[in-house]
Amino acid sequence: MSSSALQIAKTATYLPDLVEVQRASFKWFLEKGLIEELKSFSPITDYTGKLELHFVGEEYRLKRPRHDVEEAKRRDATFASQMYVTCRLINKETGEIKEQEVFIGELPLMTERGTFIINGAERVIVNQIVRSPGVYFKDEMDKNGRRTYNASVIPNRGAWLKFETDKNNLLYVRVDKTRKINAHVLMRAMGLSDNDVVDKLRHPEFYKQSIDSANDEGINSEDQALLELYKKLRPGEPPSVSGGQQLLHSRFFDPKRYDLGRVGRYKINKKLRLTVPNEVRTLTHEDVLSTIDYLINLELDIGGASLDDIDHLGNRRVRSVGELLQNQVRVGLNRLERIIKERMTVGETDSLTPAQLVNPKPLVAAIKEFFGSSQLSQFMDQTNPLAELTHKRRISALGPGGLTRERAGFAVRDIHPSHYGRLCPIETPEGPNAGLINSLATHARVNEYGFIETPFWEVEKGRVMKEGNPVYLSADLEDECRVAPGDVATDKSGNILADLIPVRYRQDFEKVPPHQVDYVQLSPVQVISVATSLIPFLEHDDANRALMGSNMQRQAVPLLRPERPLVGTGLESQVARDSGMVPITKVNGIVSYVDANEIVVKDVDGNEHVHFLQKYQRSNQDTCLNQRPIVKNGDQVISGQVLADGSACEGGEIALGQNVLIAYMPWEGYNYEDAILVSERMVTDDLYTSVHIEKYEIEARQTKLGPEEITREIPNISEESLNNLDEMGIIRTGAFVESGDILVGKVTPKGESDQPPEEKLLRAIFGEKARDVRDNSLRVPKTEKGRVLDVRIYTREQGDELPPGANMVVRVYVAQRRKIQVGDKMAGRHGNKGIISRILPREDMPYLPDGTPVDIVLNPLGVPSRMNVGQVFELLMGWAASNLNCRVKVVPFDEMYGAEKSHQTVQAFLEEASKQDGKDWVYNPKDPGKLLLKDGRTGEPFDQPVAVGYSHFLKLVHLVDDKIHARSTGPYSLVTQQPLGGKAQQGGQRLGEMEVWALEAYGAAYTLQELLTVKSDDMQGRNEALNAIVKGKPIPRPGTPESFKVLMRELQSLGLDIGVYTDEGKEVDLMQDVNPKRNTPSRPTYESLGTSEYAED
């Protein structure tokens, strides 16, 4: 055990800061990205060239945010800072310079945890992985089966340039997928002579055919080439030489229109072995000529030229927050530039000031649009700390400038050898997004160019150099090295022991002697993501199930009393710390004060550092965020130490579930098909009880008939129902509420038309005006109950920002404790999930030889076909650990300590546990890992010994309370008039095509008819049916479904003369829908059957 714990400690020290990818990127944006953009737009000149506006980018300044993070969340505000930049307006005619600091917009700021607060909600900007700008060479098969090659020059922004060859060995070029143009026409248009081109090529004879072809077409000069280019790129417009020059310049040589970016320039220089300076971001003649030369070498199959794999991580780069935000700022500044130019032209030149020219709105709008509605700005998943951390490390191929789900093929989604140590091969969603959304591997980092790097130890002459710092390599560099896996066995001084080592070299595997190894992987965990690295014995699980295990850990609900796993991997504390859920001290010192709300640390100099704790806050997913101190008064603390536990944390480690005693055996069919049988102890001891906080909100608005009022005086409500309301009509904090109870009383003025006829009659007789208001109170929804935790009232008088038309907003937070119940979903860490089918009294559960009843009974058939044997290792290791009263840390991939190491370790632990006093029954060498259980109901032993042990089991966020739903009558869809779907819409259950086939197969014609008509979209029929049921009359005959009428109308709108006709050929007017026979039942009703029976008596 010590070696496992020790090794992981050694690995864990190198785990980098897990949210660094977000923070570093935003820091870059503030320090460089924003200044770059402001500089690139400076100067802005008007159309006459008389005025110039310069942004002095280096001198931009951010004001202190108006609200801090907590206040922004409370007020539904954005945690943002105002940006000011110094502007100089220069009048070229008079030489006058006006300088002014101008407000250019609000910039949302990143919190310490790597998130943004937008309108009070915490959001995360997901990293995007896109194709890197650069030059790419591909081969394609034409329709005759001949292989052709093509080269694409892809800029960061601007027109794509694609070179291709045809069967006659002619070179063509396409600009942005337009028509093909002879490549030499482009060369001539760029001002290159035939000799310029030929001299640069290593094999000019191939290219000479293209020159001849151009001459044959009569394009001999630069002017003719420019005309030809203009004709092809702008067909239908009169061509001109100047137009051609301008077009060519703006497409490829204008830095504002065409930008390869730093990355694009770096990649092109690297691929084509050029020495163009990094500052040159547009195309050069050299780039184009070298691309053609490389393409010819491919065609002639000359060594040194290689094709590119677009799925290789060397050709894909990550765009993080900083860059995405920079692109958005560019969009805003583009709009601003147009406005400034217009204002320069319109305004009085002498009296203009920079502040009058610069309008902050376009930039504010662009930034707001990005944070509010971009596909990459997502509502943070706050179910538990792991979900939060994983969300910040997510890498998506979707979003603007990326792929779409429909277009993405298998190749993009597949695992690529270059993902090794960079993207996790396991953690990705199931379903349409599989492989498009990935997670960063544990040790990976993103370099300045946006390529993902991963660390290795250097190997010199067969010795692993662990003394220095690890070397970070990008996918391109790693391909050229021989890299050994992290679990190679070494002696104490780091010499590799085996004679032949498996290595990866150029995306292939080979075996080499130790002195040929260049690098060794840093740790066995570096291949996988954070969530996956929390699965113990991962190497014994099938990848599909490990994927489910990784994803389900993110859905674990924080429990009331969390418990650390008995069997962990050693990364639990790092995950808790980096998720930002636990407060950490930044100084060495002594704890001078502790209570439930704050912890004060006094440092060496006597300064006090106060840490406020979160108490029962609602998370984005309605789970409960609460922090509990774990230090005592007078404790000594060191910098970086955890002071309190957050939700789903215990002792500074992440604790997503509970360690429970599990037996693998069938029990009366209650665990058929992955169902789970649990003991009542889970309910009574609150093992799986969680707190959920719901937010209810109501606005008092200004209506046409007068203002709505929040009041205690609600018409037709008993005094009893108002017991818990205060004098304003708002529920008091601490009150217990059930579904249907009033939270906030509100009345709305009622117009004349709203009054029922009987009220009009009373008014006519008595002449007095009853109070004409309607009850519109906020009530607790069906299936919800709980205790009022907090009430917040927002009014304009207090200075709160309210939505337009609202006079007052009241928010009520209701907390509920949810115990585990039948229908809840539970899961282990190995993808073994199931639904609770029954909760048994503990006296009926199977029990151990010492009388302990088990907590959960799982089906043994869930293991063999799913091949997630890791759960069995965890079970037995947990069993040994609980008997030895210790916790175990197991490194995934432990073969470096010897073959079959997991097996040996577990066995050794079990033997150790059985040596304790009175514990000899714990391990039976004849039936290792199994015990003979007895039936709690009869006391008889079961036929076979059963695998029993402790496993870490989670309760997932898919709770039955949130899913269970019923409808009698409810809302209908507007067009089809069919009931809506889903719980939120109070919808019905869908009767789909296949269900109709089932009823047809049974010949249940009447059942089918009423399901398709009166129970669905026969509008008149359903009203009559309801009326008939209420009055106890026979149910009338169904009419025409509304969706049939919609179908008819749709066919008619296509110009088809289509109608419904009777046998006699008379057209039926569906829109009229009055059926004279409607009231005579088309089948015997229950009532008519009953009466006829009595008549016979």
Swiss-Prot record:
- GO CC terms of this entry: DNA-directed RNA polymerase complex
- Known EC number: 2.7.7.6
Q: Which reaction(s) does the protein catalyse, per the Swiss-Prot or TrEMBL entry?
A: RNA(n) + a ribonucleoside 5'-triphosphate = RNA(n+1) + diphosphate
For region Disordered, the annotated ranges are 1071-1097
Superkingdom, taxonomy of origin = Bacteria
Q: What class of enzyme is it?
A: transferase
- InterPro entries per the UniProt record, alphabetical: DNA-dir_RNA_pol_bsu_ext_1_sf (IPR042107), DNA-dir_RNA_pol_bsu_external_1 (IPR019462), DNA-dir_RNA_pol_su2 (IPR015712), DNA-dir_RNAP_su2_dom (IPR007120), DNA-dir_RNAP_su2_hyb_sf (IPR037033), RNA_pol_bsu_bac (IPR010243), RNA_pol_bsu_CS (IPR007121), RNA_pol_bsu_protrusion (IPR007644)
An example molecular function term from Gene Ontology annotations = DNA binding
- Residue ranges, compositional bias (Polar residues): 1077-1091
Q: Which UniProt keywords apply?
A: DNA-directed RNA polymerase, Nucleotidyltransferase, Transcription, Transferase
Q: Which Pfam families match?
A: RNA_pol_Rpb2_1 (PF04563), RNA_pol_Rpb2_2 (PF04561), RNA_pol_Rpb2_3 (PF04565), RNA_pol_Rpb2_45 (PF10385), RNA_pol_Rpb2_6 (PF00562), RNA_pol_Rpb2_7 (PF04560)
Describe, as the record does, how this protein assembles with itself and its partners.
In cyanobacteria the RNAP catalytic core is composed of 2 alpha, 1 beta, 1 beta', 1 gamma and 1 omega subunit. When a sigma factor is associated with the core the holoenzyme is formed, which can initiate transcription.
What does the function comment of this entry state?
DNA-dependent RNA polymerase catalyzes the transcription of DNA into RNA using the four ribonucleoside triphosphates as substrates.
Q: Which family does it belong to?
A: Belongs to the RNA polymerase beta chain family.
Identify this protein by name: DNA-directed RNA polymerase subunit beta
Per the record, the gene is rpoB
